[in-house]
Amino acid sequence: MNETDFSDVLKAGVTRFQQHIFPKRRLLFEKLAKAQKPEALFLTCADSRVIPSLITHTGPGQLFVERNPGNLVPIYRKEAVGVSASIEYAVTALRVEHIVICGHSDCGVIKGILHPDSVTKLPAVARWTEFGMPARDALFAEYPHLPEAEQLPILTEFNVLNQIDNLYTHPSVQQALQEERLTIHGWVYHIESGEVREYNADFNRFVSLSGD
């Protein structure tokens, strides 16, 4: 399929939305046109296979979504950073009650963090992966002899936990936690099975959200 063909697909999708979906949910969109009141900030990867509303079965207005390669959260600094602005706006202005940091299987950025030489020809990506290097360091410190085949899934989990640590450096998050109005969740979505695993602090590991 060439670029022109896919442009036609996108346009046809808009037409179907306007003719078949929007009319059935007109009242919802009229309400949303006046204001938004999302219940969660969903911070995940920009990967095209990860669709937050599909995974969580949520509708328009329920999730405030921040996406970037590798679902990374830079440590807070006063200089303007897109991720930081999204966090601050969601927590302080919209007063979301939950933040979900959601990694996923087969993540290209996590592969780049694991193998930095693989992204040397992508200088912007290489610089971006630096925000995930503490997770890589933690992986090799805890599992120095881990077989290569097992490194990627564990690093994916370590990265989620590392980004939660970075989240705690943001003043808006600190304030909301102090006020006991915010809960933070760490998830990993497995594309091949549809399973979502959440970090459980009591067990110190990721467990299935479905309870299996």
Language-model segments: residues:
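Gly/Ser/Thr-rich loops at beta-strand to alpha-helix junctions
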Residues: D47-R49, H104-V109
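Short beta-strand segments
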Residues: L43-C45, R67, V100-H104, H185-H190
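Catalytic core of membrane glycerolipid acyltransferases/transacylases, capturing the structured
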Residues: S48-P69
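Divalent-metal-activated hydrolytic enzyme cores
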Residues: M1-P38, N71-E97, G108-D212
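Conserved H-X4-D acyltransferase segment
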Residues: Q36-S53
